[in-house]
Amino acid sequence: MAITDWPAGERPREKLLERGAGALSDAELLAIFLRTGRQGLSAVDLARELLEAFGGLRPLLEADLDRFCDHLGLGPAKFTQLQAVLEMARRHLHAGLERGEALTSPEQVARYLTARLRHQSREIFACLFLDNRHRVVRYEELFQGTIDAASVYPREVVQRALAHNAAAVILAHNHPSGVAEPSVADQALTRRLQEALGLVDIRVLDHFVVGDGRPVSFAERGLM
């Protein structure tokens, strides 16, 4: 049955307009993006097929061009559209942290860092540099590869913080495995950076580990 033959309240577009995007399933959201299905499949049916083939929404969104286009119903045009949508979402979150408002919500920071780091295929260590009113001065990705006390140089983090005249820092890195549980090495690294930044009176407010689901906050865990 074509989507146009569905009850109005069950059609993805009408459902979104009536109840908001949060009321839609992953398949329904993807169907709106796809716009059309293929012979014998509605856009929602195609969306369900693709989600099953990729293993969920996140792997689909993070697929490279070759893997994305390997599926019937997808091609370079859809890939570029999707990348544009994802980049707009990241920039929207970034702009929200650049409006000069003080950071008061860990959820706000977690959403931003998730958008920045979750899609990365390798470990990245980043810093949010803040002024004395906890407003974002700069976001920087400083190190890539295996993130541990041997590969992240406290002196360089201190230099970047001083260059931005930061009064505080929020640390972040991702676990490409998807498991956001802080490791012993993560905790040791955090202590080293706290000590180094403390020598120049710069506070480390938190350290987020980004994986699948909600990022883990060291501050909320009582690890700092």
Swiss-Prot record:
CDD domains reported for this sequence: MPN_DUF2466
GO MF term set: metal ion binding; metallopeptidase activity
Ranges spanned by the short sequence motif JAMM motif, renumbered to the chain: 173-186
Pfam family, one: RadC
Keywords carried by this UniProt record: Hydrolase, Metal-binding, Metalloprotease, Protease, Zinc
Highest taxon of the lineage: Bacteria
Binding site for Zn(2+): 173, 175, 186
Listed GO biological process terms: proteolysis
Coiled coil: none
Domain MPN: residue ranges: 102-224
Family as reported in the entry's similarity comment: Belongs to the UPF0758 family.
Name of the protein described by the UniProt record: UPF0758 protein Mlg_2664
Organism in which the protein naturally occurs: Alkalilimnicola ehrlichii (strain ATCC BAA-1101 / DSM 17681 / MLHE-1)
